[in-house]
């Protein structure tokens, strides 16, 4: 433990201080000096896992004191400087841990991890992420938060019609299990949704070319399930392959047409899932997002024509005349 405010310092037997040589430098620490050291030590221990006894032993070692030598007034400047340096290092380490935790949230989204790796390699060489300075980490975090970092498109592998490998199937199974736990939706129902979206019939094997699309769909649904008010922008951040201009325009139009909302509006969970499904079908099947006509109005173009004719009697007269003429000719 750190030396107490009163009494002999640790390691000094009672009465030993009375035999110290005279002189200011050989006097025990003053109360003010001890208080200053204790304050610094408290700050260091609050930011690190070090115990006071361990920290105190390290300080004595660094300033060249043997285990049984008392800390004197002349040792105070070196001890204070040592603690100040330890505090500075602890503050930097604590700041770096906080920034790494914030970065971790972004690295899970889309292709951000590859973007950060490329940025570090280009600007900081081969330095690992956890060895960057707080200033460097802050720069990367700010670029991600402000959307100024270039996010590369994920590498596209050649599509194949082979069925999923066991490892690929197990990977999907694990993602389905996580999604079921997060949403409460039965795993069987999630699998059924995946098959229907992919156009795979019951009993057929899922082709491997759908693997990456299904992984993205499952991971996006997992992330969206944790958002109370998802938006098209937050949906886009869940994607490994960001929306291109045509996809963004198509989905924005779909949201406006079906839900009467803008691209910046908050969505319900069901709406966000519907939009994600539309994007999946566009990427897998090339089907543009569309609003299905209601079943009670299967012939909307014809109904619109009849409604227009109802407001123009002359068209009805002409139509009746044409019908009568056709009947007369047939007879």
Curated annotation (Swiss-Prot):
- Which ranges of this chain reside in the Cytoplasmic compartment per its record? 1-309
| Keywords associated with the record | Cell inner membrane, Cell membrane, Membrane, Transmembrane, Transmembrane helix
Record's bilayer topology term: Single-pass membrane protein
CC terms in the record's Gene Ontology section: plasma membrane
The lineage, from the top, is:
Bacteria, Pseudomonadati, Pseudomonadota, Gammaproteobacteria, Enterobacterales
- The gene for this chain is flk
Q: What InterPro entries does the annotation carry?
A: Flagellar_regulator_Flk
Which source organism? Escherichia coli (strain K12)
The primary site where this protein sits is: membrane
The listed locations are: Cell inner membrane
Q: What is this protein called?
A: Flagellar regulator flk
Question: What protein family does this chain belong to?
Answer: Belongs to the flk family.
Q: Where are the transmembrane segments?
A: 310-330
Regions of compositional bias (Polar residues) in chain numbering: 19-35
């Amino acid at each position: 433990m750190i030396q107490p405010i009163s009494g002999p310092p640790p390691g000094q037997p009672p009465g030993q201080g009375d035999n110290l040589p005279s002189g200011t430098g050989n006097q025990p620490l003053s109360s003010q000096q001890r208080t200053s050291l204790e304050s610094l030590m408290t700050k260091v221990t609050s930011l690190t896992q070090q115990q006071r006894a361990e920290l105190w032993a390290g300080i004595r070692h660094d300033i060249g004191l043997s285990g049984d030598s008392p800390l004197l007034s002349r040792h105070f400047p070196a001890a204070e400087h040592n603690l100040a340096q330890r505090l500075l290092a602890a503050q930097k380490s604590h700041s770096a841990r906080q920034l790494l935790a914030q970065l971790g949230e972004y690295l899970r989204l889309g292709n951000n991890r590859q973007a950060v790796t490329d940025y570090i390699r280009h600007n900081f060489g081969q330095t690992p992420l956890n060895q960057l300075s707080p200033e460097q980490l802050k720069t990367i975090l700010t670029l991600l938060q402000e959307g100024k970092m270039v996010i590369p498109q994920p590498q596209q592998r050649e599509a194949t019609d082979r069925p999923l490998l066991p490892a690929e199937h197990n990977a999907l199974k694990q993602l389905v299990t996580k999604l079921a736990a997060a949403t409460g939706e039965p795993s069987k129902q999630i699998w059924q949704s995946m098959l229907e979206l992919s156009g795979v019939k019951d009993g057929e094997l899922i082709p491997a070319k759908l693997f990456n699309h299904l992984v993205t769909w499952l991971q996006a649904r997992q992330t969206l399930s944790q958002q109370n008010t998802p938006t098209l922008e937050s949906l886009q951040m869940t994607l490994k392959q960001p929306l291109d201009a045509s996809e963004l325009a198509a989905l924005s139009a779909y949201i406006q047409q079906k839900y009467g909302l803008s691209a910046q509006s908050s969505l319900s969970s069901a709406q966000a899932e519907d939009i994600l499904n539309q994007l999946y079908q566009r990427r897998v099947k090339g089907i543009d997002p569309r609003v299905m006509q209601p079943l009670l109005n299967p012939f909307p173009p014809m109904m619109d024509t009849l409604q227009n004719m109802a407001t123009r009697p002359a068209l009805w007269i002409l139509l009746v005349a044409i019908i009568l003429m056709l009947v007369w000719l047939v007879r």
